[in-house]
Amino acid sequence: MKYEKIEQEIKNLEEQKDKLKKALNNLSIKTKISNSILGIDLNVLNVFKCFKCNGNLILEDGIINKNQIVEGKLICNCGEEYAIISGVLTAGNSCKAYEKTSLEDSISDYIHETDTAFLENVQRGGEWAKKKLMQLDLNEKILLDLGSGIGFFLRNIYEELPGNCLYIAVDRDLNKLLFLKDVIERRNPKRNILFICADFLNIPLQNYSADIVIDQSGTSNYSFEHKNFLLHELNPLFKPECYMLSSYILFKNFSIHSHISIRLRENFTSSKVKGEIQKLQFQTIDERTSNYLERGGKYENFFVQGEEIYTYSFFGRRWG
């Protein structure tokens, strides 16, 4: 009996070892390090314009590797300059080369410290958004991601993107973009991803660029500091006929101790958000409302005890 028990344990260990080897093999396929460094492809220079004067931008002092600009600057006749740092285009003064922090550790800490219900809500919302995006023909389309962060959304859909679309990831945190770029550089197959570090109102893109607008809480994050509804400010960047896939942080109620000042609260209400989407002439294809949440993680310090939040997700289209 003892011998049979030991044999069974050996068999179990071998099965676990096989599973582990298979998992590691899958991981190595997905994260196989490529020699190519992602930069700004020479073929996409025509999508840029100066955010100050709308002038065309010219490449100066460029270091180019396999058709990708990895260092250098784009300059405008008005004197505005856009530095390219490690393949990321920067605009305005908000993008400083912050001292690199270990975002991998931060993500791990965040997952362990965040309320399970909140994480499940993030995951469900992400899967819903992915399903909606996959319903569209993305061939030769430009996708504009407003507030890409560390790329939870992009990494979830990366393999599904066709090789001939352009995905533009915009964030004002250079560290997060460099981290995301490093992750993407390890992925196969290769996709056309453009990284821009800029405040939302300083995005140096031509008008009518975006075929598909991805706004996974970018507007909500902007609303913590600004009364204007972000998508109205950026509407000139969207094509008259385009799709939008968005998610908004909404409050069920506000506490007297709320961190959201009274003048900014309207942008966190369902009626306001839905009304603004209507004003932009987007028609609903599908929508989703999450459960109410009482707790978040260490980065969700925008709501206090007694307040409940939820997310409203929207998928829609407008016809020019």
Summary of predicted features, one role per range:
Residues R265-Q281, D286-E287:
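Short alpha-helix
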Residues D211-H226:
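A short SAM/SAH-binding and catalytic strip from SAM-dependent methyltransferases
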Residues Y243-F268:
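Conserved class I S-adenosyl-L-methionine
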Residues Y98-G126:
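Class I SAM-dependent methyltransferase Rossmann-like catalytic core
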Residues E120-E140, N156:
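Conserved alpha-helix/loop element of class I SAM-dependent methyltransferases that forms part
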Residues L144, I150-N202:
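Class I SAM-dependent methyltransferase SAM/SAH-binding core
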Residues L201-V213:
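A short acidic, Gly/Pro-enriched loop at the edge of an enzyme's catalytic core
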Residues N228-Y243:
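A short glycine-rich, Lys/Arg-flanked "PGG" loop and its adjoining helix->strand segment in the class I
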